[in-house]
Swiss-Prot record:
This is Uncharacterized protein y4eO. It comes from the Bacteria. Pfam families: DUF433 (PF04255). Keywords: Plasmid.
C-alpha cells in the first residue's frame, strides 16, 4: 500500500517536525519560543504543532547558520512566509514547482533544496506511519511493525544501541532493512514518555550482540 504523504497544510507534532526538519526537538521548541518561525505556521492547541511545509524553513534556519547571519536568515523566512501561506493548499508536487528564490540587494538565497529535503523526509514519515499498527489483540496494544509481532520501539532501541542490520535481521527475520529504517524514524517522531529502552531491554527471542559485565569491587573496612 502506498503511503499517504502529509499535506503541506498538515500540522505536525513538534517531535515529527524535528524529524522532518532534521533538527533536535529543542531546536523546534526554540523556533517557536523565539518566534523565528512565523506564528501563522504554529499551533499551540493541544500541544505544539508546526505546519508541515514550514519544516523546510526550520531546516534552512539551522543548516545555513554558518554561512548567513541571523538577520539574513530571518529576512529569507519572512519573504518565504507569504509564498508558503499562499501555497499551503497546494499538494507538495505543486509546491516544488514554485520559485523559492529570495533576493535581497546583493544576496540571493535558494530555498528549494530545503523544500525538497523536507518533502523527501515527509515521504519517509508517511511510510513510517504506514508500517506501524496497534491492536489490543497483539501484545496488548503495543505498536508493532505491520504484519509482525515485533515492537517498533524495540527495533528503534536496537538501532540506537548500534546493532548492525544483519544482526537485527537475524533477531527479527520478519523484517527487512527498510522496515528497520522506518521503525527508527517512527520512534523518533513519536518518542516514548519516561525512561528510554536500553541495551538490556531487547525482546525475548532477539539476539544480543555483546554483553559486557563488570563485577563490583567489595568495599573494604
Amino acid at each position: 500500500m502506498e503511503a499517504h504523504m502529509p499535506a503541506v497544510a498538515e500540522m505536525l507534532k513538534a517531535s515529527e517536525a524535528a524529524v522532518v526538519s532534521r533538527v533536535s526537538l529543542r531546536d523546534v521548541n526554540r523556533v517557536i519560543d523565539e518566534h523565528i518561525l512565523p506564528e501563522a505556521f504554529v499551533s499551540l492547541d493541544n500541544g505544539r504543532h508546526v505546519l508541515a511545509g514550514a519544516c523546510s524553513l526550520i531546516a534552512f534556519y539551522f543548516e545555513s547558520a554558518r554561512r548567513l547571519t541571523s538577520e539574513e536568515r530571518l529576512f529569507a523566512i519572512r519573504i518565504a512566509e507569504g509564498r508558503l501561506a499562499r501555497a499551503r493548499t497546494l499538494p507538495w508536487s505543486a509546491l516544488l514547482r514554485e520559485d523559492w528564490t529570495v533576493h535581497h540587494e546583493f544576496l540571493t538565497i535558494d530555498l528549494m533544496p530545503f523544500m525538497r529535503g523536507a518533502s523527501e523526509r515527509l515521504d519517509d514519515l508517511a511510510a513510517a506511519r504506514e508500517i506501524v499498527t496497534s491492536s489490543p489483540d497483539i501484545l496488548g496494544g503495543t505498536p508493532v511493525v505491520r504484519g509482525t509481532r515485533v515492537p517498533v520501539y524495540d527495533v528503534a532501541a536496537s538501532v540506537a544501541a548500534g546493532h548492525s542490520v544483519e544482526r537485527m535481521l537475524e533477531a527479527w527475520p520478519s523484517l527487512d532493512a527498510e522496515k528497520i529504517r522506518l521503525a527508527s524514524i517512527y520512534a523518533e517522531a513519536n518518542p516514548l514518555r519516561g525512561r528510554r529502552r536500553v541495551f538490556g531491554d531487547l525482546p525475548e527471542g532477539s539476539v544480543i550482540v555483546s554483553d559486557r559485565r563488570v563485577a563490583r569491587r567489595r568495599k573494604t573496612g
